[in-house]
Amino acid sequence: MSRTDRVFLAFLIASVPAACSTTQPPNDRAVCEAYSAERSRVEVVADGTVTRVLGVAPGRVSPHEGFLLRLESGCSLVVRVEANTDFTGRIGLSEGQRVAVKGEYEYYPRGGVVHWTHRDPRGRHEGGYIEAGGRLYE
């Protein structure tokens, strides 16, 4: 293997973790602030503990899997999280499980909802994810 090949291979190996790492550090405070200000359409990254699994229900366009998430820091808010199973597949969460989510927060008085927790195939919306059990659902 030539020196050029070794340098290229080293560069490629060093680049893979950065390219594969799509998660962002959670900022539960952003969710708490959006809730307090009654704001919607706020892109958030949050983490917490699943307090209730709502299961899969038919949505307006496609089925969604829902669960309630108690935020880990910032405030003790419980938000509903919805995942479009056409994109993420079934996640299969359990109560007490730690989860991180990225999506769009929508206010409502009982805590709000985080949706768009998946990629947008049309590219019109920022993609989201759910990270659970060491696996990333997009």
What are these regions (language model features)?
Residues C20-E138:
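OB-fold and OB-like single-stranded nucleic-acid-recognition modules
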